From Swiss-Prot:
Belongs to the periplasmic pilus chaperone family. GO terms for cellular component: outer membrane-bounded periplasmic space. This is Chaperone protein AggD. Residues 1-22 form the signal peptide. GO terms for biological process: cell wall organization; chaperone-mediated protein folding. The gene is aggD. Keywords: Chaperone, Fimbrium biogenesis, Immunoglobulin domain, Periplasm, Plasmid, Signal. Its main location: periplasm. InterPro entries: Ig-like_fold, PapD-like_sf, Periplasmic_pilus_chap, Pili_assmbl_chap_C_dom_sf, Pili_assmbl_chaperone_bac, Pili_assmbl_chaperone_C, Pili_assmbl_chaperone_CS, Pili_assmbl_chaperone_N.
Amino acid sequence: MKIRRIVSTIAIALSVFTFAHAQSFENVENNAKVFSLHLGATRMIYKPNSSGETLAVINEHNYPILVQANVLSEDQKNIAPFIITPPLFRLDALQSSRLRIVKTEGAFPIDRESLQWICVKAIPPKYEDKWAKEEVSGKKSDKATMNIQVSVSSCIKLFVRPADVKGQPDDVAGKIKWQKVGNKLKGVNPTPFYMDIAELRVGEKEITETHYIAPFSSYEYPMPVNGGGDVRWKVVTDYGGISKTFETGLNI
């Protein structure tokens, strides 16, 4: 009898706890949002002797955001010798603006392209932010709020193309040589352009890793199991489109 009373008491306590716990979650408002910007291009070609290039930035959210932009080195670990103006600014809801990118210093090779990255980050407003106070005021809730906000940096390739490098990547993309090295497919790029591989197949097998191949360099892709036959590939063009299909035999 004593054991039965103890069990009953525990059951009642658990019921009260579960009810209170559920009630507490009813008063919690969950907000999970991903914040990003839409950029007006997927890549940019920069002529070293130019006065600069511009890039459109669009805020597709229905509230203002802060836009933070910079140019990074190829490995995205260091600041590149460029300035972006403005580097930090408010962009109102459903509005667009333009960034100006200008080379400041630094010597780039004159016989090949160099790769940098333009990275633009969207910083969303918080209730206490004075710069967005008029948009978020009056939006407090009686409920507790659990906010999960993820700011995403949008990065596009910035190709520094010297005057001595003529034409476009898709003009010479057919010169890439392919060979089987162990369980890898090695692509050799004998051109001064970055070859941004958009699609790659060995026979009927697709290689999903579409990493670029730097100028006068090579890159090894994972070879498909039982892959064999001709290699077919496409590259990304200067305007962000996809080139025609190139095809060649596989050197073993």
